[in-house]
């Protein structure tokens, strides 16, 4: 039953996405990056506001780029996740994801965006009377080649999982790689899109299970004139090597974030809650989670 429910949030997210895209089909927008893209104009009325120096990107431009996984904005998010109900209502797993985004301009037409997700985990034991584990998980490094302009923002490239953990319960201990793709549209304050990757293991200890895993993240976000952003997304993982009851992990997240500048230091602050419509039936499946995040921004100077 959990496996079947994995499709519910995906259909919901894509249904909202199609509806919003249809409403905005008559307007135009330029791309941004990061998992979003960059634009020459702001998407909300807040675009008229400029930075204090007049040389930095405006707050509205920064807020727009934060919604774009492939924008030209250098950022360092620190994402804190508390996942509850790990095989028992009172068991919690903590995950800190450090997710730097580094864009590179290849030429006037193309950008290269490097995104890293480096997890640090602390989780309860598989069995209630065991000992928990803490440490570094396997980082995922993604590279997106993205056109600098276009109404539809997109990027494509390779994703590589690095076997950096020394604890078998915190990672696969396998080298894995595959394609990744992101596409989105931004207009009138809305950002609608999806990010997907599929990786397969190709090296590592032979006694460890093979990796054959898909990640799918549809997202819908709306940014207001006062720079509040409200987002709903799904972060679905499908482990194709596992049996059906343990294959799907499908949290749906509801989040609010605010861009704020203290002096000349811009940052985004986020809080959210998520519910797992599907999760593995084994000892590490969660029921719900709380998320907090701080994203440090390094805006580029205007020429």
Set out the residue ranges of the language-model regions.
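Sec/Tat signal peptide C-region and signal peptidase I cleavage site
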Residues: 18-22
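Transmembrane beta-barrel domains of Gram-negative outer membranes and organellar outer membranes
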Residues: 24-303
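N-terminal secretory signal peptides that target proteins for export/translocation
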Residues: 1-5
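Bacterial N-terminal signal peptides
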Residues: 7-17
């Amino acid at each position: 039953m959990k496996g079947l429910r994995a499709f519910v949030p995906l259909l919901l997210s894509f249904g909202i996405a199609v509806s919003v895209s249809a409403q905005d089909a008559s307007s135009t927008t330029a791309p941004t990056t990061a998992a979003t893209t960059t634009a020459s104009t702001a998407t909300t009325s807040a675009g008229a506001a400029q930075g204090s120096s007049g040389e930095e990107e405006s707050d509205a431009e920064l807020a727009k780029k934060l919604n774009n996984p492939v924008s030209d904005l250098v950022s360092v998010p620190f994402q804190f996740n508390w996942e509850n109900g790990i095989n028992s209502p009172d068991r919690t797993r903590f995950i800190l994801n450090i997710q730097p985004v580094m864009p590179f301009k290849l030429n006037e037409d193309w950008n290269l965006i490097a995104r890293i997700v480096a997890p640090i985990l602390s989780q309860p034991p598989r069995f209630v009377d065991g000992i928990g584990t803490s440490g570094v998980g396997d980082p995922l490094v993604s590279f997106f080649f993205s056109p600098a302009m276009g109404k539809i923002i997109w990027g494509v490239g390779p994703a590589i999982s690095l076997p950096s953990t020394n604890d078998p319960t915190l990672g696969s201990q396998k080298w894995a790689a595959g394609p990744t793709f992101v596409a989105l549209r931004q207009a009138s304050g809305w950002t609608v899109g999806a990010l997907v990757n599929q990786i397969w293991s190709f090296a590592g200890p032979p006694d460890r299970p093979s990796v054959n895993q898909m990640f799918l993240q549809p997202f819908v976000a709306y940014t207001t004139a006062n720079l509040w952003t409200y987002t709903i997304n799904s972060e679905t993982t499908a482990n194709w090597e596992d049996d059906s009851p343990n294959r799907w992990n499908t949290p749906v997240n509801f989040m609010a974030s605010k861009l704020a500048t203290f002096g000349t230091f811009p940052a985004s602050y986020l809080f959210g809650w998520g519910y797992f419509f599907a999760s593995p039936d084994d000892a590490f499946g969660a029921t719900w989670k709380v998320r907090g995040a701080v994203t440090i921004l390094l805006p580029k100077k205007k020429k």
